[in-house]
């Protein structure tokens, strides 16, 4: 139903060129302090988009986002770990 999407992190020399990234995908976030932008495109097009972006003169570095490959369902702790008390560095004796 929905196409698989993947983020691409683009490190820039200057932020004034960040508007040019619109033609490569959907811009999700732009950091002014660290000078990078996160944009999303279809998962099938990630490799060719990264090559195109890396060839631009105002781009320092291009990295893929590994979020689609991370396991986001976490296991809960067992009852033994939940009920155990942790020492605070001193004894209450």
From Swiss-Prot:
Disulfide bonds: none annotated. It comes from the Bacteria. InterPro entries: DUF2129 (IPR016979). Keywords: Cytoplasm. It is found in: Cytoplasm. The keyword DNA repair does not apply. It holds the Pfam family DUF2129. One of its GO terms (cellular component) is cytoplasm. Belongs to the UPF0298 family. This is UPF0298 protein GWCH70_0997.
């Amino acid at each position: 139903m929905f196409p698989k999407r993947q983020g691409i992190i683009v490190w820039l020399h200057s932020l004034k060129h960040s508007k040019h990234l619109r033609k490569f995908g959907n811009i999700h976030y732009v950091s002014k302090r660290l000078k990078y932008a996160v944009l999303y495109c279809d998962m099938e097009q990630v490799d060719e988009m990264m090559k195109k972006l890396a060839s631009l003169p105002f781009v320092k570095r291009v990295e893929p986002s590994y979020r689609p490959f991370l396991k986001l369902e976490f296991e809960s702790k067992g009852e033994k770990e939940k009920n155990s008390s942790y020492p605070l560095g001193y004894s209450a004796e």
